[in-house]
């Protein structure tokens, strides 16, 4: 899988930009705030229907325009895909794949698979459980439409349950019984799929991490949930919802479920979030990202596109070398402010360089 070309109209700081990409390594060089990350953002949006930088689609539209247009042409082994997206300031958007209108975001996912690695991804390790849940949910939604459906349903019912808790009486108690049964069904599936994904990360990630650290470190991922028996997750969840209902009423929120879960990343049996050095935390994220690439490849038979947003300068020479030696079979799109540090690791025959300046791109 690789992107042949991208066409942007009124997207961020681009007026009308058409870009041909190499199926191998593409490097965009320029100072900060020139539009490098905007290119990656447009590709990411074409993959999952949302930005990695903002929750407001109108932020993607050039400030003096009423809409933006994105076209991404994707070469696939079986069938090429042309993804067209129109986003309007009034909040509406229209998406087609090979000229067929997309009604749900789940229909967009899987046409273009990408893995994004940016400096902000360090939050997956360092920050709150919400960042780790978001990582799992995004990766699972890319490869599992049922997961996407059940996650949407779970969050919808969870919101309704929380609203009901604020107005609790005997009649609403019966309604909450129904919510609890639905949440248990969808929540059990989410928990089991997350745990399975972490099992895959453990198998693949351990080998990757050992390569990066020259066998000096062992990494482990462990799902943190109240569920003890995954085979009976639905029954356990239902029991917890009923048991905690009074407490939930007092707090006006649901205190247990996959929306509260977390996962632990440990290196040599030490919690990386609390005790890991910044170098170890970066390496853990690197492992997560490259393991995600392999998981997608194992499921769909093709590598996704790898997006590296100004991260190579954050890595030491050994980690830079690992990254650039691992992408020979993967279309990779890199942004950076200079290539001096990584130039010695690049395969010049497989690399295409672009200069970015104030929304203008020049192929070198």
From Swiss-Prot:
One of its GO terms (molecular function) is single-stranded DNA binding. It comes from the Bacteria. Coiled coil: none annotated. ATP binds at residues 30-37. One of its GO terms (cellular component) is cytoplasm. The keyword Membrane does not apply. Its main location: cytoplasm. Keywords: ATP-binding, Cytoplasm, DNA damage, DNA repair, DNA replication, DNA-binding, Nucleotide-binding, SOS response. One of its GO terms (biological process) is DNA replication. InterPro entries: DNA-binding_RecF, DNA-binding_RecF_CS, P-loop_NTPase, RecF/RecN/SMC_N, RecF_2. Pfam families: SMC_N (PF02463). It is found in: Cytoplasm. SUPFAM superfamilies: P-loop containing nucleoside triphosphate hydrolases. Belongs to the RecF family. The RecF protein is involved in DNA metabolism; it is required for DNA replication and normal SOS inducibility. RecF binds preferentially to single-stranded, linear DNA. It also seems to bind ATP. This is DNA replication and repair protein RecF.
């Amino acid at each position: 899988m690789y992107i042949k070309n991208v066409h942007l109209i009124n997207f961020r700081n681009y007026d009308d930009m058409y870009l041909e990409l190499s199926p191998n390594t593409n490097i965009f060089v320029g100072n900060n705030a020139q539009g490098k990350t905007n290119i990656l953002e447009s590709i990411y949006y074409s993959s999952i229907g949302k930005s990695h930088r903002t929750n407001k689609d109108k932020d993607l539209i050039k400030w003096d325009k009423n809409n933006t247009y994105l076209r991404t042409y994707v070469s696939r082994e079986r069938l090429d895909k042309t993804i067209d997206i129109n986003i309007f300031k009034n909040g509406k958007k229209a998406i087609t794949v090979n000229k067929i209108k997309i009604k749900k975001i789940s229909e967009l996912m899987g046409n273009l698979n990408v893995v994004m690695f940016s400096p902000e991804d360090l939050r997956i390790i360092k920050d709150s459980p919400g960042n780790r849940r978001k990582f799992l949910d995004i990766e699972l939604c890319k490869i599992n439409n049922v997961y996407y459906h059940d996650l949407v349903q779970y969050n919808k019912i969870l919101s309704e349950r929380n609203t009901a808790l604020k107005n609790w009486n005997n009649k609403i108690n019966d309604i909450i019984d129904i919510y609890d049964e639905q949440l248990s069904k969808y929540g059990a599936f989410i928990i089991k799929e997350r745990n399975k994904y972490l099992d895959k990360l453990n198998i693949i990630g351990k080998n990757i991490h050992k390569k990066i650290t020259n066998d000096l470190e062992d990494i482990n991922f462990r799902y943190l949930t109240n569920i003890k028996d995954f085979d009976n997750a639905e029954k356990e969840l239902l029991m917890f919802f009923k048991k905690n209902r009074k407490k939930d009423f007092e707090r006006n929120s649901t205190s247990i479920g996959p929306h509260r879960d977390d996962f632990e990343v440990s290196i040599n049996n030490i919690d990386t979030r609390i005790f890991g050095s910044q170098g170890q935390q970066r390496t853990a994220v690197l492992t997560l990202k490259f393991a995600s690439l392999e998981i997608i490849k194992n499921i769909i038979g093709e590598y996704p596109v790898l997006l590296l947003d100004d991260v190579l300068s954050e890595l030491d020479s050994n980690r830079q070398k690992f990254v650039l030696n691992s992408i020979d079979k993967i279309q990779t799109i890199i942004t950076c402010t200079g290539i001096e540090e990584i130039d010695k690791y690049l395969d010049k025959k497989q690399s295409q360089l672009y200069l970015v300046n104030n929304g203008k791109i020049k192929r070198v």
